[in-house]
């Protein structure tokens, strides 16, 4: 029969075996159709994930078998966030305290770290990484020197068996991505290559499971290579490569190993589409085995999707493997034909299931879903984003001109995160205020030195990403002309004309400083606070405990003359430009004020705040009359009088930075505030009237940028002045090294 599949070079006709004719839902006798259709694949993944979750094995949820299941579950969960995958993982991690079993040097007990590290980065949850990091720090700092010869004392404290190359190395790479500490990569590199040199058979291009099988042949007299043992290796390589920096010196070693192993495994595929347990003796036993098959399929398909493997050459094998796998799924979602826990080929039946088999199915199916989405959108645009820094960058916004070669029609527009296989929230914005949409905004996390692709899909039938306008700003006329803005992490307000009036019409407060609202992460508070009115006490969502007064609060401008700061009054006009799931933007105008010597200054300020960020970006333009230039100061409150500061830090390296840590009220926790300027200040910081300023010369109409941010220790993993300073330094480094974006 003829089967048509999409290759990287277009549609190609394959002449496959008659057994492959059952590639449609109408002829499948299993519970999982083998159709290469996005919804069908997604339904299959949910079916298998839910069945396995409802049928747990009687062993620790931290066992390596569950580690392999979680590896598939996290890929499925990240690709279908509305599905059951991520909730199941969060529940498992929280119930187990994100820990590992007690064999700290044993690779098997590291396997749960795949999912724990992904959840740490996905959720911004450092607790998910702490315990696995402590374990691997111990392994790295006090490495074992045991022999790799299997069954010798301490051999399993090293990666002396092929399974270990899946269980442990990817966790080291993920820790390097999360922490920016390249020592994890160096350790992994050294140990991996030693194991590869020891277990890899260069003649056959396959891995022995361990050294016992160097001399133990298969029943037919050929070398014994176990399919799942090789499946572990080829499935582990994508987990390593996807988080390894693009410029890592030995990256080509892993790329070449993927190609060599895939080529050798392709030759071993049986006519039923699977890889039998014994690769060179498929009659030992003559049965399809699904865990090895699906791990191998995943590694091959990832290689195709990334361009390492030729699609025309490997797609027929992948098609046959997926058909065999779907035929092994019952109508209830149980994946059968999975060899039980073993270290060599053995016997099993269609009734044998295992959690690692389901994990392999979720990995392979999630990767296949990406391929199908690629195939179904031939007109897509690709946005390639490079992180030039050697550090993890959470919640970074990517800005792309719109329309970028497309129709400019927002209907059916989707932004697809290729790494995670999911549609992500996006926002179309008019960033220059001319009434025309000009920019596409979206966000992701970026790991050190990595290159990521995102697809812009127009007229797509994929479902929209769940999103809410978490980035929000508005004028608040009902509260004396406040103007407030917030995202999922932080909230602020500035003061308008009405509050400056004397009582009883106003409060007599003249201030162009910025207030900080302490809020619980994820909870919108602006409308609730103003509706309640009583926001100076914490009713569960946060409170206003910060004292601004006439100072700069957590960020503001002063113009200096003769060494003295001159500040504006309250804002004269303020308007929201746009709100959305990624960014809010607004414009504020401060009316002209006298700075002496016949000089008057006005400020127009544009402020943006992105989701997942604690810092607002400010672009100020001064309108100067009576002088060619003035000395502007970007400042923040640092004096004891208003907020009882416990620590204040100022640094001028690579751009100015100030941080402060205060306890405005005894029982309501601490606030961190900070100002960052992406330019080198003139001289040292200047203290004046309870505030500290970073100075620069500014000409009339010359824009300059600065950032202000805040954190509340009761709603953040940042719990100290040192932690807040480290976060501000991280943000400053990211500001100085923006993401590199290319559209093609």
Name each region found by the language model.
Residues 433-446, 673-744:
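Beta-strand-rich recognition/accessory modules
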Residues 162-163, 173-279, 286-297, 309-338, ...:
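Extended ligand-binding clefts on enzyme/binding-domain cores
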Residues 378-473, 509:
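Alpha-mannosidase-like glycoside hydrolase catalytic domains involved in N-glycan trimming
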Residues 86-90, 98-214, 219-223, 331-332:
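Extended ligand-binding groove/face enriched in aromatic
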Residues 603-605, 609, 614-649:
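Acidic (Asp/Glu-rich), glycine- and aromatic
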Residues 527-611:
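Extended, loop-rich substrate-binding clefts of extracytoplasmic carbohydrate-active enzymes
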Residues 455, 460-565:
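Solvent-exposed N-terminal domain segments of exported/luminal and surface proteins
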Residues 35-67, 74-95, 99-122, 126-138, ...:
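CBM-like carbohydrate-recognition segments
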């Amino acid at each position: 029969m003829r089967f048509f599949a999409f290759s990287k070079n277009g549609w190609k006709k394959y002449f496959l075996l008659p057994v492959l004719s059952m590639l449609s839902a109408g002829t499948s006798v299993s519970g999982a159709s083998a159709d290469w259709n996005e919804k069908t694949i997604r339904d299959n993944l949910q079916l298998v994930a839910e069945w396995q979750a409802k049928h747990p094995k009687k062993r620790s949820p931290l066992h390596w078998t569950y580690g392999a299941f979680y590896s598939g579950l996290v890929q499925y969960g990240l690709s279908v966030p509305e599905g059951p995958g991520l909730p199941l993982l969060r529940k498992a991690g929280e119930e187990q305290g994100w820990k590992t079993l007690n064999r700290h040097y044993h690779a098997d007990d590291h396997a749960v770290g795949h999912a724990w590290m992904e959840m740490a980065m996905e959720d911004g949850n450092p607790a998910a990484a702490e315990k696995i990091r402590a374990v691997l720090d111990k392994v790295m700092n006090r490495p074992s020197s045991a022999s790799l010869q299997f069954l010798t004392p301490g051999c399993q404290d090293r990666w002396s068996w092929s399974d270990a190359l899946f269980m442990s190395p990817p966790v080291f790479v993920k820790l390097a991505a999360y922490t920016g500490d390249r020592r994890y990569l160096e350790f992994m590199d050294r140990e991996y290559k030693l194991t590869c040199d020891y277990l890899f058979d260069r003649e056959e291009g396959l891995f022995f499971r361990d050294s016992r099988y160097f001399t133990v042949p298969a029943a037919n007299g050929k070398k014994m290579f176990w399919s799942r043992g090789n499946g572990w290796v080829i499935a582990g390589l994508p987990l390593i490569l996807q988080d390894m920096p693009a410029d890592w010196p030995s990256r080509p070693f892993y790329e070449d190993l993927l190609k060599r192993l895939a080529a050798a495994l392709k030759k071993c595929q049986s006519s039923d589409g699977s890889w039998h347990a014994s690769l060179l003796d498929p009659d030992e036993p003559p049965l399809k085995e699904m865990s090895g098959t699906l791990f191998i399929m995943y590694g091959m398909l990832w290689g195709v999707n990334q361009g390492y493997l030729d699609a025309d050459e490997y797609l027929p094998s992948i098609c046959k493997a997926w058909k065999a796998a779907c035929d092994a799924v019952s109508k209830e979602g149980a994946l059968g034909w999975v060899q039980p826990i073993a270290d060599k080929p053995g016997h099993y039946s269609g009734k044998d299931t295992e959690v690692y088999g389901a994990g392999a199915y979720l990995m392979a199916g999630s990767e296949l879903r990406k391929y199908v989405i690629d195939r179904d959108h031939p007109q897509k645009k690709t946005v390639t984003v490079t992180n030039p820094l050697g550090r993890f960058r959470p919640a970074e916004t990517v800005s792309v001109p719109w329309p970028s070669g497309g129709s400019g029609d927002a209907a059916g527009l989707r932004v697809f995160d290729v790494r995670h296989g999911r549609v992500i929230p996006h926002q179309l914005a008019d960033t220059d205020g001319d009434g025309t949409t000009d920019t596409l905004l979206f966000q992701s996390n970026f790991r050190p030195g990595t290159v990521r692709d995102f697809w812009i899909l127009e007229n797509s039938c994929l479902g929209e990403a769940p999103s809410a306008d978490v980035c929000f700003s508005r004028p608040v006329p009902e509260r004396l002309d406040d103007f407030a803005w917030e995202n999922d992490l932080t909230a602020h307000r500035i003061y308008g004309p009405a509050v400056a009036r004397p009582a009883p019409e106003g409060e007599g407060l003249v201030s162009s400083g910025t207030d900080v609202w302490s809020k619980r992460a994820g909870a919108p508070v602006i409308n609730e606070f103003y509706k309640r009115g009583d926001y100076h006490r914490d009713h569960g969502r946060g409170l206003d405990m910060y004292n601004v007064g006439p100072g700069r609060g957590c960020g503001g401008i002063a113009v200096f003359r003769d060494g003295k700061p001159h500040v504006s009054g309250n804002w004269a006009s303020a308007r929201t430009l746009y709100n959305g799931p990624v960014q809010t933007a607004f414009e504020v105008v401060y009316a002209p004020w006298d700075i002496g010597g016949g000089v008057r200054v006005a400020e127009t300020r544009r402020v943006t705040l992105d989701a997942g960020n604690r810092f607002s970006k400010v672009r100020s333009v001064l309108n100067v009359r009576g002088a060619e230039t003035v000395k502007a100061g970007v400042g923040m409150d640092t004096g004891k009088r208003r907020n009882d500061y416990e620590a204040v830090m100022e640094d001028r390296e690579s751009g100015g930075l100030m941080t402060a840590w205060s306890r405005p009220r005894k029982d309501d926790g601490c606030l961190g505030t900070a100002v960052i300027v992406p330019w080198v200040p003139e001289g040292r910081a200047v203290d004046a009237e309870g505030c500290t300023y970073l100075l620069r010369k500014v000409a009339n109409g010359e824009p300059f940028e600065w950032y202000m941010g805040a954190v509340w220790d009761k709603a953040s993993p940042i719990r100290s002045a040192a932690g807040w300073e480290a976060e501000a330094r991280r943000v400053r480094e990211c500001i100085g090294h923006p993401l590199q974006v290319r559209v093609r």
